[in-house]
């Protein structure tokens, strides 16, 4: 007589040591799959009944039992046990306690291999949809903010040095476009997630006359996997998500880095709401951008989850291996981390104050109008390379005497070229510099309006 009381214990003469059992158990984290596991089981037993693999009466009893468990789960009344290893065994054990041995018929024509794969496809499909909705909110917030700041002028940077004046709205629309591509990547990810592994069984399919198309429809998947080995053994849809999540977090992190700089004493371009700031335990004056810093910091954690799963998968032979238990925690963690990061970013932008005057003033005491002068000279017939050299020397001279290009007398400019006129001073203003950059996709005010108009159409279409 066997001493192993596991649902799979028939072949064993002894039980696992408790500490070994704890090492192998996954219920501490895969219980997040509980609602998806019960949903998949409901579809599976419906199919078993309709194909007469089990009787309609048995299918009805099992469905009634699953409904009881679903209600208890929603009410927070289900208790899971480590002795049942994982969420699948826990649900089956709880179902058996509710309806008796007939619960054992639920696992007909099914393995935990296709069961867990189905659960994860359902989970990730659900979370991808939620994440895209949150990105839609973030992108809408960016467009609204950009529309309010089309005419707000700020320094544009390269190498963290003042480069050329730009519209703050233009800067915000750059991030809108990045997050739009992030959304598109998640949409493509959905294509590879919206597949049903259910019915693939352990690896080779089943001898029972199952209807995989029926369970696919019941679970609202696009189509079933066409190869049972592929269905149970790959996790590329999760790796694809973790890769997309890493790119998305990189974009959030870059934006947070700028927000952290902008709200510093040295910049003062923005003021964050108290809701997204914290203080210091010793320095009373501090208002720290902790939420932006945490998003920046948690980006590395999402990267780590990607590399962890890639490493797990790199040498696995087909089909299922226990290594695949390591596919879940990183996925759960990344879903939760990215989701809250998107929400915080959107709300942080909605509640921050933009100090327009400081942004504008910072473009009046720098040399970010140097390109305007070079372009002006080139328009008067001076070769651009020569104009570049002339302006570079003027910048050097101004730097030495504490003046700026707009301070140089017209008489001095006309010594460079008699074609230079008084309009040079209007051209050297930051607002004019921005307005004149009206090439497609440029920072010119009219171009920013076009970008916003296009974005509004994209958002409406979604």
Curated annotation (Swiss-Prot):
<dbReference type="InterPro" id="IPR024083">
    <property type="entry name" value="Fumarase/histidase_N"/>
</dbReference>
<dbReference type="Pfam" id="PF14698">
    <property type="entry name" value="ASL_C2"/>
</dbReference>
<dbReference type="InterPro" id="IPR022761">
    <property type="entry name" value="Fumarate_lyase_N"/>
</dbReference>
<keyword id="KW-0055">Arginine biosynthesis</keyword>
<dbReference type="GO" id="GO:0006526">
    <property type="term" value="P:L-arginine biosynthetic process"/>
</dbReference>
<dbReference type="InterPro" id="IPR009049">
    <property type="entry name" value="Argininosuccinate_lyase"/>
</dbReference>
<keyword id="KW-0456">Lyase</keyword>
<comment type="pathway">
    <text>Amino-acid biosynthesis; L-arginine biosynthesis; L-arginine from L-ornithine and carbamoyl phosphate: step 3/3.</text>
</comment>
<comment type="similarity">
    <text>Belongs to the lyase 1 family. Argininosuccinate lyase subfamily.</text>
</comment>
<dbReference type="GO" id="GO:0042450">
    <property type="term" value="P:arginine biosynthetic process via ornithine"/>
</dbReference>
<dbReference type="InterPro" id="IPR000362">
    <property type="entry name" value="Fumarate_lyase_fam"/>
</dbReference>
<keyword id="KW-0963">Cytoplasm</keyword>
<dbReference type="InterPro" id="IPR020557">
    <property type="entry name" value="Fumarate_lyase_CS"/>
</dbReference>
<keyword id="KW-0028">Amino-acid biosynthesis</keyword>
<dbReference type="Pfam" id="PF00206">
    <property type="entry name" value="Lyase_1"/>
</dbReference>
<dbReference type="GO" id="GO:0004056">
    <property type="term" value="F:argininosuccinate lyase activity"/>
</dbReference>
<protein>
    <recommendedName>
        <fullName>Argininosuccinate lyase</fullName>
        <ecNumber>4.3.2.1</ecNumber>
    </recommendedName>
</protein>
<dbReference type="InterPro" id="IPR029419">
    <property type="entry name" value="Arg_succ_lyase_C"/>
</dbReference>
<dbReference type="InterPro" id="IPR008948">
    <property type="entry name" value="L-Aspartase-like"/>
</dbReference>
<dbReference type="GO" id="GO:0005829">
    <property type="term" value="C:cytosol"/>
</dbReference>
